[in-house]
């Protein structure tokens, strides 16, 4: 594994980039800032192709509001109203998405420099979020491990707390298997027969709605451009897909299929231990520098806004417990 100085924070703190290489040709570049995946090169007939959106220097990441390639936490996705109640006590959070908290608040995990250590084959990144950070209770120690395994990128997440809290971790890589252009010609399948409809703030209503007979039925390979403009109220709310698909009723100890994407000779399979995956089609990318819908995210996670929905799988983490999950991105020829 190689490393180099990627840039410096405004206070002068160094940020390093680490390059993981597999003999089969898969290469990943990960930076300490936000534990972000800055590039992922996949072997193709003509050489290699970078299939994620990212920057070559640190400065654009410091101004990035799209969470490009970042680990999102301590609570990925949205919490309605920027508040929740746990064990009878209400906690008020920093809000950064209207009146709601998105991806952990104004200064979530994506905006911190993580400690990094390598054993030569994997990269372990650690971040300690203090009690009260963005309003969340408990000191939370989070570790994310990146490793390459043949044709796959494997990401493991682990977290521990010293006081009851809520945790939802995900990865916000934007994929474009063509390496350029929009993702409208990408074909996708999602292994879910239900999804979570949302309100105007993109907060789940609490319903688990069957996908059958709707624009959200992606159980078979479907060209994104053929579905994203369907006459569907939910698609209009999100400006496209920005919805959570239900994979299982509870986390699984072993990875299960979540999604499959194909474009320009590359197929990507996503497998996870998590109960859901958020499909986001880059509807809010503004064109500086990445244009509208030029990347798609498959954010494996627990359900958004779970603290307000007792019927959803719990995201509560207590002292003595360990949060753990794994997501695998496997690549091959289409």
Model-assigned labels for residue ranges:
Residues 1-334:
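An exposed, glycine/acidic-rich loop-and-rim segment of catalytic or binding clefts
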